[in-house]
Amino acid sequence: MSHFLTFCFLSLLLLLHGANAVTETELRSLLEFRKGIRDETSHQRISWSDTSSLTDPSTCPNDWPGISCDPETGSIIAINLDRRGLSGELKFSTLSGLTRLRNLSLSGNSFSGRVVPSLGGISSLQHLDLSDNGFYGPIPGRISELWSLNHLNLSSNKFEGGFPSGFRNLQQLRSLDLHKNEIWGDVGEIFTELKNVEFVDLSCNRFNGGLSLPMENISSISNTLRHLNLSHNALNGKFFSEESIGSFKNLEIVDLENNQINGELPHFGSQPSLRILKLARNELFGLVPQELLQSSIPLLELDLSRNGFTGSISEINSSTLTMLNLSSNGLSGDLPSSFKSCSVIDLSGNTFSGDVSVVQKWEATPDVLDLSSNNLSGSLPNFTSAFSRLSVLSIRNNSVSGSLPSLWGDSQFSVIDLSSNKFSGFIPVSFFTFASLRSLNLSRNNLEGPIPFRGSRASELLVLNSYPQMELLDLSTNSLTGMLPGDIGTMEKIKVLNLANNKLSGELPSDLNKLSGLLFLDLSNNTFKGQIPNKLPSQMVGFNVSYNDLSGIIPEDLRSYPPSSFYPGNSKLSLPGRIPADSSGDLSLPGKKHHSKLSIRIAIIVASVGAAIMILFVLFAYHRTQLKDFHGRNRFTDQATTRDTKFGRSSRPSLFNFSSNVEQQSSSLSFSNDHLLTANSRSLSGIPGCEAEISEQGAPATSAPTNLLDDYPAASGRKSSSGGSPLSSSPRFSDQPVMLDVYSPDRLAGELFFLDVSLKLTAEELSRAPAEVLGRSSHGTLYKATLDNGHMLTVKWLRVGLVRHKKDFAREAKKIGSLKHPNIVPLRAYYWGPREQERLLLSDYLRGESLAMHLYETTPRRYSPMSFSQRLKVAVEVAQCLLYLHDRAMPHGNLKPTNIILSSPDNTVRITDYCVHRLMTPSGVAEQILNMSALGYSAPELSSASKPIPTLKSDVYAFGVILMELLTRRSAGDIISGQTGAVDLTDWVRLCDQEGRRMDCIDRDIAGGEEFSKGMEDALAVAIRCILSVNERPNIRQVLDHLTSISA
């Protein structure tokens, strides 16, 4: 009996010892797994010892970094190596011996490899997080065998393929995050697979399907789902039905932005938990459900921007809203008569009308208020008294008039943009007393007098020493007077200084060279005299002092800028070793610019297209620093909340990453081509944007200098140059070569669509192609890219916010690609990426120069003067191109000399940039027409249209202006002095015609002989007919018939 008791006691001791011991199999599995891991800082393996270093091989290795054991059984239950700077190709099959592993978390490293099916054999796993790495391949179907799994995060990797079936088996799953991969599947089928989940983030993938689903498809998650993010996918069809959306009783966050969801929104009924609703960048239309703006739904954030909503918004009585974005829709009527509560309000890009002063009645006290690009009128209320917290104010591009109100109190204004209105009178002194102001844009108004200064020399243009934060000052296109003071150098942080198109005078102070951060300086179209100061900031990428009365020698450090930075005007300004500028056509005649609307048009390109966009992003970048994430992804998990701070960046990557000889300065500010709120408001909800994450892994976030110049057209400095006027966006001068850095295939989620079978290339080949900037336009930026085989392409990057939805874009691109004509440069392909800044058009690169270069480039003269017969040949070939397009009911839409290329040796015409408006949103088309109008090529009927769109007859008008330019060798933007005062080109030609002196208009280079004088007069008569009123204007076939009948 005693032997039996002894045996039982020893057996119990052995059993107890084994229950608290790690097995050798587990240790060996761990050590095998370690072999694939490297520390990126030391390039060594992670410091796990082998079993020989353990005092007792059966002891749990709790001292190994990231390893945890069960205190009761001793088995390894957790491997947590989050954000340790590790890399390596992991072999997940080596973990099969860890049969009791509960937590495997490897996020935020640089691991790669495939997730093998055997991982599904570790049925004890409860938490699996492989996010923010480089894992690739399909998600194995056996992952559905992890019965105990409650948290699965595979986001921000390179997984691809279909969504695996069998997720219905994961009854314990509460959080599913697969965002930023290449996974596809029908969202309706996926909803059917999920059971009891609370958090679902499938954003930035390729999921498709609609949301108008039967109740049985969503019944398994309708009671539990709290957070749903399907943004940046390819969803189409309708939104949830009224019945189905009403079944989600616990839903807190819904983000479906950047899809193709269409139709009207249903009534939302009772949604007691809904706090964030983001439906921006879809195809929704109809009325905005009123309950979304009332307190019945406790929304904190509502973003319906960039859709097609219509109707009026009478009142907004929600007491919970902190962010409301209804921008870029078709909303109309008066501004809401009441607005209870909100911190960020964006109603821009609609057609709201009425008196802007109604905002004084609002109870809301916003930090950010954007009412830009509407039809508002009336006078501006004093916002410092109405909104004490206001830091960002934009009312640009309206019809608000009267004098500017004074600002006072403890306001902390960061950005004020009142450009493109009808303000008059003096600028109040108080605008220059807010030390926090970083950006002030009062351009394109009717302001006069000096820029005020609180000091003894108030009559001069001075800058306050107490104004250290100013980074952008744009007062262009007004009637300001006075001198530029010597102490302007106190604006130490200024990056953009635009004082063009005013009546400023005096000499340029030498203290301009103290503006060490200056990137853009435009002092053109004033009456400055004297010499240009030496040693201006070397990093400037936009510089223009043309149309002044400067003299002396151009400083050596400025001689890399093109001639259009200095001329026309400045007839006494010279450059050693070069022929002086031809001043015979000098446009700096006294009083020229202030007596003509065209000088104002020219400045629109800088002040409107660039500054207005950029200002809005300065503004929001500042505002975002004051907002906190109130609801992060990790609310539904046990992860550290610090992880999502990277999604709060204000910058977004450009498709092209430049590396050039232009020095780039760092800045605390970041600028984006996207909208004021839609790009960055996701930080409020903790929902990441695809773009923000790419800047983490794919390319550095764009700094202020880079995007500053993308959005702010250079005033003929290094970055771009003029085609007929000093501020136009034509590609007259090339930049230094830069590298075209498209995301490589392992990161490039979009597709190349070929419209011509003869073109064959891959995204990888495009990504490594050396490229140089050719120019910028209202559409975006133009590059020349050289492929591996030497073939050269012209790549047009389309600016964010201009492009139609993918289906419409593809349909129209196919039509444009089908156009085949010997004088038309064909569209060969296009690239469509998941991010808005990834829209590219590809065509063959042409050797040759634009018609604008042949007509106007004279410093030095690079081209022989064109004869009348050569000019007539150009006109006929352009008309033939237009006839081809018009026969297919497709207007060119952007016809100007910079889009007419003359190929050697016989100056054969090749037309470019045609029909691009068909790929653009209505706002993008309107912006293109605005720029056409600024340059003088837009038909008058387009300027007065509420929703302008290019027509066949507007092409004829533009052709008529170009024909006048061919015959007169004067630019459409020229201001010409005559007996009746300063007039533009078309008015001058009409006047000459009325007075019977047509030959006075003809260019001296071709008007000398009598042989072709009748032909020249006949051609000029054709041009005049082309610019008649739309009802009297001939069609292009009639124009071509007349031109071909002229002898030359």
Swiss-Prot record:
Domain Protein kinase: 768-1045
Composition bias type Low complexity, residue spans: 716-733
Domain of life assignment: Eukaryota
Region (Disordered): 696-733
Topological category with respect to the lipid bilayer: Single-pass membrane protein
An MF annotation (GO) of this entry: protein kinase activity
Keywords recorded for this protein, A-Z: ATP-binding, Leucine-rich repeat, Membrane, Nucleotide-binding, Phosphoprotein, Receptor, Repeat, Signal, Transmembrane, Transmembrane helix
Family membership noted in the UniProt record: Belongs to the protein kinase superfamily.
Name recorded for this polypeptide: Probable inactive receptor kinase At5g10020
Organism expressing this protein natively: Arabidopsis thaliana (Mouse-ear cress)
